[in-house]
């Protein structure tokens, strides 16, 4: 007796269902799921895989997303704690790790998360040896270094989400001050994602008009309008959100989907993201920091050389020294 399906559909072709644009998200906490929904809403993948160690939570999140399939254009959403589910991913996004507690610095998390990475990274490499790795877990600059070391991947394929979000926060706050949409407010926050990030005031502009040319004191203590408060708000904002709601999720999820779009569509847009910066700005260690990078299908193909003031360069170097001080003590 022919099944209903056989009566309805005549098959013309035995297909092997290999994904062409698969994305994996490791970690289905608030950040991982914000990344997942943002990626789904942007139609970036033909398959989305989720991995976590908490099996019930993982299955529940997968089912919840699958039930939204009618409203999405990603035909396959899968999950497992077994990394075989991640096979043949183009992009693997790592959000797993210990969460930052209220008042805890991102650097404090480091050894807890290194131990988690020692398990995750080799599994990713085993099943997707040609993928790009996008690290989101904090402290992101150090963990991007850790992922690079453990994976053995070339540095172009190991990317930290870095200051993409810090710069987005900066542009939003700048826009709020000026009454202009963030897209039309340009400014870059570079260096460490977190407390020692560096705002590049010389490049801050609207429509190519440098704000520093109008206010030479911009970003200094002498500035009557105290624009450096904008950068202070960027640094404090995550702590404030964590204090208010327990964690941050939506903005980082959107920021990660923005990076995923540049990679999956080979856009070659410039983003402030964490890359191996050895040889730039007088930095001689294997340190990952955010600088403007051209991002496309091969990951980070080029770095834009930003002209920094001596003070900005010194701050970048100090960040690098801080990070290296922690990195050289790590056990892995």
Swiss-Prot record:
Q: Which residues carry this modification: N-acetylalanine?
A: 2
Q: Which residues carry this modification: Phosphothreonine?
A: 309, 322
Annotated residues for binding of substrate: 106, 138, 169, 248
Q: Provide the active-site residues from the annotation.
A: 193 (proton acceptor)
Q: What class of enzyme is it?
A: oxidoreductase
Pfam families, alphabetized: Ldh_1_C, Ldh_1_N
Q: Kindly give the CDD domains that the UniProt entry links to this protein.
A: LDH_1 (cd05293)
Q: Where is this cross-link: Glycyl lysine isopeptide (Lys-Gly) (interchain with G-Cter in SUMO2)?
A: 57
> What Gene Ontology terms describe what this protein does at the molecular function level?
identical protein binding; L-lactate dehydrogenase activity; lactate dehydrogenase activity
- Known pathway: Fermentation; pyruvate fermentation to lactate; (S)-lactate from pyruvate: step 1/1
Q: TM segments?
A: none
Query: Mind listing the GO biological process terms from this record?
Result: glucose catabolic process to lactate via pyruvate; lactate biosynthetic process from pyruvate; pyruvate catabolic process
The protein's PTM annotation reads: ISGylated.
- Name the residues that bind NAD(+): 29-57, 99, 138
Q: Which UniProt keywords apply?
A: Acetylation, Cytoplasm, Isopeptide bond, NAD, Oxidoreductase, Phosphoprotein, Ubl conjugation
**Phosphotyrosine PTM positions:** 239
Q: Which reaction does it catalyse?
A: (S)-lactate + NAD(+) = pyruvate + NADH + H(+)
Q: Which InterPro entries match?
A: L-lactate/malate_DH, L-lactate_DH, L-lactate_DH_AS, Lactate/malate_DH_C, Lactate/malate_DH_N, Lactate_DH/Glyco_Ohase_4_C, NAD(P)-bd_dom_sf
Report one GO cellular component: sperm fibrous sheath
Q: Does the keyword Ubl conjugation apply?
A: yes
Q: How the protein assembles, per its UniProt entry?
A: Homotetramer. Interacts with PTEN upstream reading frame protein MP31.
| UniProt record similarity statement | Belongs to the LDH/MDH superfamily. LDH family.
Instruction: Give the protein's recorded name.
Output: L-lactate dehydrogenase A chain
């Amino acid at each position: 007796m022919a099944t209903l399906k056989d009566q309805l559909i005549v098959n013309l072709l035995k297909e092997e269902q290999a994904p062409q644009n698969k994305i994996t998200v490791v970690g289905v906490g608030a950040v991982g799921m914000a990344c997942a929904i943002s990626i789904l809403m942007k139609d970036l993948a033909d398959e989305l895989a989720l991995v976590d160690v908490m099996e019930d939570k993982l299955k529940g999140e997968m089912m919840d997303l699958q039930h939204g399939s009618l409203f999405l254009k990603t035909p396959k959403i899968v999950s497992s704690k077994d990394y075989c589910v991640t096979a043949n991913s183009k992009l693997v996004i790592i959000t797993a790790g210990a969460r930052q507690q209220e008042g805890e610095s991102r650097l404090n998390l480091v050894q807890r998360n290194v131990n988690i990475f020692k398990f995750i990274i080799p599994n990713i490499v085993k099943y997707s040896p040609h993928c790009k790795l996008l690290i989101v877990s904090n402290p992101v600059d150090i963990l991007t270094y850790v992922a690079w070391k453990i994976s053995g991947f070339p540095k172009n394929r190991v990317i930290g989400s870095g200051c993409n979000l810090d710069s987005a926060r900066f542009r939003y706050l700048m826009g709020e001050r000026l009454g202009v949409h963030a897209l039309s407010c340009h400014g870059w926050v570079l260096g460490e994602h977190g407390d020692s990030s560096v705002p590049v005031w010389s490049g801050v502009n609207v429509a190519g008009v440098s704000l520093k040319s109008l206010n030479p004191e911009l970003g200094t203590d002498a500035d009557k309008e105290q624009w450096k408060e904008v950068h202070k708000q960027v640094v404090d904002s995550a702590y404030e959100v964590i204090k208010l709601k327990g964690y941050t999720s939506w903005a980082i999820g959107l920021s990660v989907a923005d990076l995923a779009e540049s990679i999956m569509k080979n856009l070659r847009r410039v983003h402030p993201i964490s890359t191996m910066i050895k040889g730039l700005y007088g930095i001689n260690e294997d340190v990952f920091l955010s600088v403007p990078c051209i991002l496309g299908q091969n990951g980070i193909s080029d770095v834009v050389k930003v002209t920094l003031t001596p003070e900005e360069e010194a701050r970048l170097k100090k960040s690098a020294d801080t990070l290296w001080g922690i990195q050289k003590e790590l056990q892995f």
